[in-house]
UniProtKB/Swiss-Prot annotation:
Keywords: Endosome, Glycoprotein, Secreted, Signal. InterPro entries: Class_I_gatase-like (IPR029062), Prot/Nucl_acid_deglycase (IPR050325). The keyword NAD does not apply. This is Glutamine amidotransferase-like class 1 domain-containing protein 1. Belongs to the peptidase C56 family. Its main location: secreted.
Length: 220
């Protein structure tokens, strides 16, 4: 009966990179599966570009293949998203985030709305770079004074393209007046400060998303 229907689930916006540098397959898999169990999930990328998955391996290749066949695998255009329609924001680890999301005016607008309303935000690994776009007119960062984690310089320097990275999250966060912390390279490390959850790397995806779910549950 209609009167016995479960209440509608809250909406969550999952923002991923559309750049060639791609999206971590393992981080996206965990973000998508955990979040879709609790939310009505909408995936969005800049320009609605198809995601290029990186770090595909034997454990996730089948899932990625199946995901691509689903209708909801086609991302919405980030530029057309109204942040007011969503209760939570989730950004998986995306090496491509440094290329497109970190300078996205559309994402900045959404993040500023989420910040002003204290709505739950979760960013993981390279996805933390996406938060860097959210600067005010006076160039101050909306997350100034927050405690944040993300890829440490020790983790980044191992990658061949380190010298050409457009942004070092650790440096940006410290320069912007926020507090950066990191554990050992590849260690699981999650920071929760007010309504913002950040995970150091792709390995931190599951506990980071679980903290997002906890935040959303505590707001009901």
């Amino acid at each position: 009966m209609a009167s016995e229907r479960l209440p509608s689930r809250p909406a969550c916006l999952l923002v991923a990179s559309g750049a060639a540098e791609g999206v971590s397959a393992q981080s996206f898999l965990h973000c998508f599966t955990l979040a879709s169990a609790a939310f009505n999930l909408q995936v969005a990328t800049p320009g609605g570009k198809t995601m290029d998955f990186v770090d595909v391996n034997e454990s996730n290749a089948r899932w990625v293949q199946d995901f691509r066949l689903k209708a909801y695998a086609s991302p919405a255009k980030l530029e057309s998203i109204d942040g007011a329609r969503y209760h939570a924001l989730l950004i998986p680890s995306c090496p491509g985030a440094l290329v497109d999301l970190a300078s996205s005016g559309s994402l900045a607008r959404i993040l500023q709305h989420f910040h002003s309303e204290s709505k739950p935000i979760c960013a993981v690994g390279h996805g933390v770079a996406a938060l860097c776009c959210a600067t005010s007119e006076d160039r101050s960062w909306v997350f100034q004074g927050y405690s944040v984690t993300g890829p440490s310089v020790y983790e980044l320097v191992r990658a061949p393209g380190f010298a050409h990275l457009p942004l070092i999250v650790e440096d940006f966060v410290k320069d912007a007046g926020a507090c950066f912390s990191a554990s050992e390279p590849d260690a699981m490390h999650v920071v929760l400060d007010r309504h913002l959850v950040t995970g150091q790397n792709a390995s931190s995806t599951v506990p980071a998303v679980q903290n997002l779910l906890f935040l959303c549950g505590s707001r009901k």
